[in-house]
Every structure is written in C-alpha cells, then in structure tokens.
C-alpha cells in the first residue's frame, strides 16, 4: 500500500464510480479496480458495496477514508515543514448554497488566487443538507451554509449575517394583500433549500397550507417567474439589491425571526491538519466575507 493507493481509494469514494475515478486520476479502470482489490486484501475487509449503478463505502471503507484523509493531510504538512518551499499548494473543495455562491464565490476565488496562488479551489453549489453530508463524508473540505449546525463532528465559524425578504410581483402593495390571494403560488427551490423551509414555515404561521408550489433550479428562474406575476418567494436581500434591483419585482421586510440568517463556514474537526484548509479558514474567518 502507498499514498497513490489511498488517493485512488478516495477518488472512488468521492465519485461513487470506478470509471469516473479512473478518469479523474488519469488512469484506467482496471488499475483502479486492482488497487482497490489489493487494499481490501491487505485490510482483510470489503471497502465498497458494488451495485449496478454505483459503489458505496462500507463501514470499513468509511473508517479507511477517515484515516486516509488524515494521512494525506499529514504528508502535505510534512512537505511544507521539510521542503524548501513554504508555498501552500493542492486542491481544496468548498461548497456553497446557490445564493451564497452567486454573492461571494467570485470574491473568494479572487482572494485565494492572490493569497494562495497554488491552491486549486474547486467550488460547488448544493442544498444545505447535501453540503453538510458531503463535508461529513470528506467529499468537501468545507462549506458555507445557513446556521445552525448541531453535528458534533463539525466545527463552524460565523462568517456573516444576512436578511431574507419576501419577493413579489409589482402589483402587491403589502404582504397582507399577497396572503389574501385565493390561489397563492410560491416559487421555490428543491426540497432541502433553507429559504424554501423558511417560506413554508412562515405560511404555516399564517394558517396557510393549501398553496401551489413551482420548483425552480436557479435564482434567475425564480426571479423570472416572480416578475411575470406567477408567484412570490423568499430570497436574500443582498441577491436582489446586487443583481436584480432593476427588475420589475418588489421586496417586503419580514419579522426578524423569519428574516435573520447567519452564514457559517463548516469543516470537519479532524480535518484541520490540511494546510490548504488552515489557510482558507485563517483568510476568510478574518475577512468575514465583507
């Protein structure tokens, strides 16, 4: 067993597929399959459950992934300590909700490029619950999500405060008028969206459970439907003021308990040996993403 074997193992765990892992690691599938088989023989345990569609980690596989991540981080740390160069380099996978990605993603890429030019920053957007799960399972090094965070395996840093507003077509003069609509229509993201959950809970507090939902997969789509008069939604105030302030839509303030959102940066407590993650945390915990 060597570090390359562990890297191939981690790639299969990340992609859930031997072919995709081989492509990502610039090798052939037969090599990946052989290396995984050797690891399973060496540890005397099955590391993956193989199905027709994908492969999933077994309990033993999850344990090995935990240790392989630590080993990889320690090797990178040793290179910095022993090598001639103190430049931090490597890949860092960071996740965002779509709205945070739109607002803060470009700035983060710029800051990292200036401060740590050899760090390959791989950004992805997903729903809050998926981001948490991906960090827990080492598919992401860190993620920006709306608080709160309760998992004991995760550490978090408060990054910024946001405010949610109700976004409606121009014709409405108040939220009361909106709620009086006989066929209320909400424009929302998929299940698992933090803003959708806030909207649904807000409607419940107003005894509204019978309403139509139109699911969109982009901020632009949500705004387009609102502008067309089809329905309303909840979105961060900064998204509207930054990108959509000239659109034919209207925003209304919400009560503090509904509108207040704290964005935090989450990462695994046992992943802090990663030099790239340490650099990322130190940079953005001080900047607070202003």
What feature does the model see in each segment?
Residues 42-43, 64-86:
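Alpha-helical linker/hinge and terminal dimerization helices associated
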């Amino acid at each position: 067993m060597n570090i390359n074997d562990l890297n191939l193992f981690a790639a299969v765990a990340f992609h859930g597929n031997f072919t995709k892992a081989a492509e990502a690691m610039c090798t052939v599938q037969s090599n990946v399959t052989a290396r995984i088989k050797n690891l399973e023989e060496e540890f005397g345990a099955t590391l993956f459950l193989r199905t027709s569609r994908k492969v999933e980690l077994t309990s033993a596989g999850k344990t090995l992934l935990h240790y392989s991540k630590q080993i990889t981080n320690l090797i990178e740390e040793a290179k910095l300590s022993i090598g001639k160069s103190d430049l931090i380099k490597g890949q860092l996978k960071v996740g965002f909700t779509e709205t945070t990605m739109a607002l803060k993603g470009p700035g983060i890429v710029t800051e990292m490029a200036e401060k740590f030019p050899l760090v390959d920053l791989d950004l992805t957007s997903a729903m809050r619950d998926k981001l948490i799960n991906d960090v827990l399972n080492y598919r992401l090094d860190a993620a920006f999500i709306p608080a709160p965070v309760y998992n004991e395996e995760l550490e978090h840093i408060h990054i910024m405060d946001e405010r949610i507003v109700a976004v409606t077509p121009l014709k409405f003069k108040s939220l009361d008028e909106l709620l009086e609509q006989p066929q209320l229509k909400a424009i929302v993201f998929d299940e698992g969206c933090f803003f959708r959950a806030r909207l649904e809970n807000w409607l419940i507090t107003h005894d509204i459970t019978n309403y139509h939902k139109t699911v969109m997969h982009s901020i632009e789509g949500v705004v387009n439907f609102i502008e067309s008069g089809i329905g309303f939604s909840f979105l961060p105030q900064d998204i509207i003021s930054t990108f959509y302030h000239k659109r034919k839509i209207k925003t209304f303030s919400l009560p503090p308990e509904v509108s207040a959102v704290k964005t935090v940066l989450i990462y695994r407590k046992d992943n802090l040996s990663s030099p790239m993650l340490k650099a990322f945390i130190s940079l953005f915990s001080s900047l607070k993403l202003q």
